[in-house]
Curated annotation (Swiss-Prot):
Pathway per the UniProt entry: Carbohydrate biosynthesis; Calvin cycle
Top EC class of this enzyme: oxidoreductase
Designated name of the protein: Glyceraldehyde-3-phosphate dehydrogenase B, chloroplastic
Gene: GAPB
Residue numbers binding NADP(+): R94, I95, D118, R163, N402
Amino acid sequence: MASHAALAPSRIPASTRLASKASQQYSFLTQCSFKRLDVADFSGLRSSNSVTFTREASFHDVIAAQLTTKPTGAAPVRGETVAKLKVAINGFGRIGRNFLRCWHGRKDSPLDVVVVNDSGGVKSATHLLKYDSILGTFKADVKIIDNETFSIDGKPIKVVSNRDPLKLPWAELGIDIVIEGTGVFVDGPGAGKHIQAGAKKVIITAPAKGSDIPTYVVGVNEKDYGHDVANIISNASCTTNCLAPFVKVLDEELGIVKGTMTTTHSYTGDQRLLDASHRDLRRARAAALNIVPTSTGAAKAVSLVLPQLKGKLNGIALRVPTPNVSVVDLVVNIEKVGVTAEDVNNAFRKAAAGPLKGVLDVCDIPLVSVDFRCSDFSSTIDSSLTMVMGGDMVKVVAWYDNEWGYSQRVVDLADLVANKWPGLEGSVASGDPLEDFCKDNPADEECKLYE
């Protein structure tokens, strides 16, 4: 029987760590391509005929594969030995399992997932991780070790089952960051129970309740984060993560006066499979049989990361009978007059190739929702649907995988928290392992490749 202490002998285990920002710097194909990452290796997906999900290994990956960990007392070698932060996932549902798959696909992550809290126990957790109706079969080797532990490709992960965060063994396991994925503990007192239990930081994977919890959207305001800002932060909602990046572009380039948004959103676990009681009478109706109008705070929440837009945006959601992938339809009045649809799309293309690379994409191909399944981008602009009316009214449509894409941003935010951790900041690499090596060894033969 594995004990809690068995997973916590080393406070912060050492591991080879590559570029912290590499997770946000990718090489992309033209038009409607997704991050060129071998998704099939860890999600079990098969690409459609329209979009390629898998890729060849990049030069960066080839270099990374050749790096070795620095032995104790040995001379410097390529590869920085830095600490990893221990992570707990509280709530092993859709976002919790997507987060684990996304994290598993990043070999350079500064995070070490050591435990999940799941009310179903080891058998349920491993089965649902391995076999997923949306993602397909997880290609990793998932095994049950005992009734408290499972492994992914040999990496042990503990399973605990307790609905009360105060009773979770975060102190005993030395947990640094909790990924709060239950959707229940979204305010200060609730999420704060993880801190009381011994965790250092909490990332809420939902909109937070209360003005005391800062919200961050990667690509929009994540640079505002600092280790001492707060111990509890929110990654906002999937829809806010889709909306905020391209709204930022529109406001910076054209100036937003006001606007409304509709998200046509796949049904979620908060709805009923068959008609049944629910506090929202519309969500009480069968999710797979109806278009369900409901509320969303996504548009208003944009002002949490773009304060200048407070009071300028609002919207609703239409829940539809699809299990995954959603689409935002935004209509705004703009200050700049005389623009064309191509002007708007070019602004998005510029941002997608620059400051929002890896977060925003532009698609020129007439695709449908399933083609955006497992897209790593927060939002993908459907350029053919961009419209301009009267020179000062703009309509933009953007696709997003409300599970996978959102979970990638949760990993990004957790990486950012790790990279800002006191004592680890100096260990952050440049984003290119060869570049880091050449800074200290400019005369090395390999470094001449970059001269």
